[in-house]
């Protein structure tokens, strides 16, 4: 399944039967030092102010996105906690499909903007967000620890 093919990606909201798949995707995507803990993932997945969307190709869960809904004094904003795709399915439209679904669902929920952090070392993530017209708002030093900074992005979606 390698290459630059673009798959037809279905998206759907998380349900409790997906939790093990989320753990497996997280383990495939990140080294232990930077993974979300299982308890944090479980908490976010079940949080009523968080939406977890799955990316599915040929009935296989190949990625997911977690977004938190929150409000501030000016407008409602959503925060993308993570978008993760199994390595064998990267650069094939899965992350883009998840990002589009997240934007659509948060816009429907009344959110005016999306915000996120992405590692300065994550060139594919940076390219994804910039292609989707996210604006780099700054750099947060040591955001991920170990000398790894994060770019902070924001996009108006209303």
Residues covered by each model-derived region:
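Terminal substrate-recognition subdomain of acyl/acetyltransferases
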Residues: 1-4, 142, 146-158
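Acetyl-CoA-dependent GNAT
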Residues: 3-88, 96-101, 105, 109, ...
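Short, Lys/Arg-rich nucleic-acid/phosphate-binding segment
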Residues: 72, 140-142
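Active-site acidic-Proline motif in GNAT/NAT acetyltransferases
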Residues: 86-92, 120-121
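Conserved GNAT acetyl-CoA-binding A-motif
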Residues: 99, 106-117, 128, 140
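Conserved active-site tyrosine of GNAT-family acetyltransferases
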Residues: 129, 134
């Amino acid at each position: 399944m390698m290459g630059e093919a673009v798959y037809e990606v279905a998206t759907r909201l998380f349900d409790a039967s997906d939790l093990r798949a989320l753990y497996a995707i997280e383990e495939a995507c990140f080294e232990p030092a930077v993974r979300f803990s299982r308890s944090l993932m479980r908490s976010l997945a079940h949080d009523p102010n968080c939406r977890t969307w799955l990316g599915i190709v040929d009935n296989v869960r190949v990625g997911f996105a977690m977004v938190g809904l929150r409000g501030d004094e000016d407008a409602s904003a959503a925060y993308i906690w993570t978008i993760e795709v199994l390595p064998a399915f990267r650069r094939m439209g899965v992350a883009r499909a998840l990002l589009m679904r997240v934007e659509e669902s948060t816009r429907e929920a009344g959110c005016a903007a999306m915000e996120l952090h992405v590692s300065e070392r994550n060139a594919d993530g940076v390219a994804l967000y910039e292609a989707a017209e996210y604006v780099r708002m700054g750099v947060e030093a040591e955001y991920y620890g170990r000398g790894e900074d994060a770019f902070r992005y924001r996009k108006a979606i209303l």
